[in-house]
Amino acid sequence: MRPTKLAMTKLEQYESMTEAEAVRRTVGAFRDEFFVSEEKAQLACEIAVREKKLLSKLDYKDGFSLYVGIPFCPSVCSYCSFSSSPIAEWKDKVESYLFALLKEIRAIGKMSEGHRPDSVYIGGGTPTTLEAEQMDRLLKTITENFDLSNVLEFTVEAGRPDSITEEKLAVIRKYPVTRISINPQTMQQKTLDLVGRNHTVAQTKDAFYLARKLGFDNINMDLIAGLPGEDASDMEDTLRQVEEMHPDSLTVHALAIKRAARYGQEGRKQDLHSEISQMI
């Protein structure tokens, strides 16, 4: 369910009207067709209007978004279904993967001549499982093979705090990266231990403040609502701790256990809808 996508579709249907009238009709449609409360319908429309203004800056004719994946993590979280492997088990393959990746980046750069990316996103996995020198080569290859003059956002998913070092952050700062993400998922140590995230709450805070010290002024943090063993009070405490850190943006996901995740393979059932609803 993506409520802002529904709102965007409705707003586009009423494009010939004033913004106020389009919003009024969209809120009515949410209420009458989807039985959504007035408050939530208004919120969906407000976000959709903001998104519409941001999306209007994209070059749909000649622009594109570039995604680069690093499929390694310090450890694989129990709930994760992404294609990622523990870095320790694949250490001898990382250099080969990077060699092939850089070759592909150069090839895509040639294929996309005449076009400029609107956004660049380095995700995974955990990109900062790469060594600083490897990260340097990756970012250098991207900047040398694409015209980044039109980029609205360049993100490096720093991700797990136990993979973040001052040396790696200093490398990222050398390049036109505009946003990084440091992702605790929760600030409850008992949960981190339970789901296989082998880092501490203190490491999250240390990584965040280190990034601030080095000059990063657009730091996102990811949280997951509904992690095993957590209730609304745990989420409230996590949000309180995150608020004290003042990240520039916050992304909250609802837990979804998929077949590829270890929890999914173990047949664990998810019955947390009411708890997640309270958290959100």
What spans do the regions from the language model cover?
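Conserved non-cysteine loop/helix-boundary elements of the Radical SAM core domain that shape
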Residues: 84-278
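N-terminal [4Fe-4S]-dependent radical SAM core
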Residues: 13, 20-66
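Canonical Radical SAM [4Fe-4S] cluster-binding loop centered on the CxxxCxxC motif
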Residues: 61-96
